[in-house]
Amino acid sequence: MNYNNPPINFGINLGIELGQQTILSLYHSLFQSLINPIQKGDTVGLLALACKVDFEMLKPAIKLMENAWGLKVVLGESLTSEYHQFAGTDTVRANDFQMMLDNPEIKAIFSARGGYGSSRLLDSIDFTTFQKQLKWVIGFSDITAVHCHIHTLNIESLHATMPKLFLQEDGEASLESLRKVLFGEETNYKIEPHQMNRLGAANGQLIGGNLAILVHVIGSKSDINYDGKILFLEDVNEYLYNIDRMMIQLKRSGKLQNLVGLIVGSFSDCQDNDVPFGKTANEIIQEAVAEYDFPVCYGFPVGHEINNWAIPCGREMSLLVEEYGVSLKGNYLYI
């Protein structure tokens, strides 16, 4: 049975008369794999899945994880490797990732930074052991490719700030949101209303991340089913016309039509041509989803900004968009 595409009569088989959205939500919650919280004294892994990183810049983050969070940190070879713009060859980075996925002592895996290169590794990784011993895989931006692939396995992953950014100025809220999810503390988000919001309520698994990467994996082994899900989007340094092109790609490929909710994060440092495109990123997205009726939240603190709150991809969440604000709440029952 394909758990990512449940039969429409699933609720009927349970003898429950529910709306289709609630049926999908219930179905996914029954079969999703929740990851147990980490604890002080646990071991975590730190590697670089994509671009090379200055190891000296990571030392404060490593110290924080060891001293403030009480964790033991295993360091990957990729942290000190370099191959052109990458953190070592594909083989070096893949070996790090495979080792940390397979090591039962490692309870979470942090990618030090994004950039480009994660998707180059995915077809060489064996996720069999990972499916039996679940652990958090953490990162954002280019790491969206990894989140998508993990979602095809019906396992959670964590879209969140990365060690390279742990101690950036005014980044305490992002770091604390990551710590709370990792250690299993209740994390319910509330934000102020946005004038472009479309009101409504939704329940479903959260999916998403970087728009360019989501479009990049369409048609690949890492492509995911969007039906019945709450999608969140963010991006950085993209031309406005390209944001429009990517949203059209999501729409034409059928990714938007069966969503139950949409969360629009930051679209930072957007570029434009000499002849302006004529719309902002938010306006482009608004136009792309205008024909649908699911709730839409704009201005959520996720993306390439100081405020980049941790979002558990694949977790069953409730989104409520009201006139006076927005709330996002999750299911925190662990197996």
Question: Can you describe what each PLM-predicted range is?
Answer:
Residues 27-105:
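ATP/NTP phosphate-donor binding region
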Residues 53, 57, 205-236:
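Conserved beta-alpha junction segments in alpha/beta enzyme cores
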Residues 108-119:
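N-terminal glycine-rich "phosphate-gripper" loop used for MgATP/nucleotide binding
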Residues 127-149, 156-162:
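Short, acidic/small-residue loops that bind anionic groups at enzyme active sites
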Residues 156-213:
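Conserved anion/nucleotide-ligand pocket segment
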Residues 225-281:
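Internal helical hairpin/lid segments
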Residues 269-335:
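ATP/nucleoside-binding phosphotransfer catalytic cores, i.e., glycine-rich phosphate-binding loops
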